[in-house]
Curated annotation (Swiss-Prot):
Pfam families: Arginosuc_syn_C (PF20979), Arginosuc_synth (PF00764). It comes from Nostoc sp. (strain PCC 7120 / SAG 25.82 / UTEX 2576). Homotetramer. Its main location: cytoplasm. It is found in: Cytoplasm. This is Argininosuccinate synthase. L-citrulline binds at Y89, N125, R129, S177, S186, E262, Y274.
Amino acid sequence: MGRAKKVVLAYSGGVDTSVCIPYLKQEWGVEEVITLAADLGQGDELEPIREKALKSGASESLVADVKESFIKDYAFPAIQANALYENRYPLGTALARPLIAKILVEAAAKYGADAIAHGCTGKGNDQVRFDVSCTALNPNLKILAPAREWGMSREATIAYGEKFGIPSPVKKSSPYSIDKNLLGRSIEAGALEDPKFEPPEEIYEMTKAIADTPNEPEYIEIGFTQGLPTTLNGIPKDPVALIQELNQVVGSHGVGRIDMIENRLVGIKSREIYESPAMLVLIPAHRDLESLTLTADVSHYKRGIEETYSQIVYNGLWYSPLKAALDAFIQKTQERVSGTVRVKLFKGNATIVGRWSDSSLYTPDLATYGAEDQFDHKAAEGFIYVWGLPTRIWAQQDRG
């Protein structure tokens, strides 16, 4: 008897998930494999995906258009949280996984599958994100992870697929692993595994090399409503269109590249290359607007929440009780985070050069050093005495 009768497989059309189809049937005795690909804004690469899945042995191949949900329900909350894992990575891939898990579980229920499967290896973070998310949504479903057990190198995986007529989208001489969605691209493997190796320009698609960027700066204005980006240069945009346009504009100025050594959940360090133009402007712009509209104590406390939020999303705990509790706090903080941020794009830099809001807590008459100054300087002496009183008492006690 096989490990499952009917399986819904998370499918990308790449090497690992394509090889999973014959592997599940030939090696694990699965009778029927239904593939499910999430349209997260990858672009043209999804066009032939049904045909490839069917040729690889799938009984049915599904594509779910979840672009709008991806941005509204996953990316936008992350922007409100200023989510940057290890203060650099805007979680483009990590944010997609709980959504894919959700539609996998829904498809399994619809088609009567007794298991779901994915092509994640045992060294990556995605296996955790898929397994934990699917378990949270339906703890009774079996989860199969062939790539975690088959023990094949990337070259061997490609060779296994070729035996079943599965073409590889990568060359054996340059086997980069690429994941792409509306929020950006992640590139790893191959020569990039050497951390001293400079990434070749050929791996980038969304961002221009500095030498090829415009010689004049471009200014953009991003409007936020309760922490959510809603306008670009004064024009209302739906969530997907806003991200798409920002990716194009920001990337054309060479902004949005990340080359980092990342601490994976499974305990190893990995070299990761990311392109994420829109998010690497939206998050700093949102944080800047918060500095104008949040009180100091809320702003400072939220920084710690943001770090925890980034970690639990990265670590696959999107559907956890802690995540839900943090969401409630973050949503409360966003009630007055409405306004506009002006950003200058030039030669690989995105510089915030202005911000304004009807909810601004910045008071010019109190901040100015000019003749309009209304700050009560005499009050400072009493404040300093009371503020420093514990230190004064400690110092007196310390001196005996």
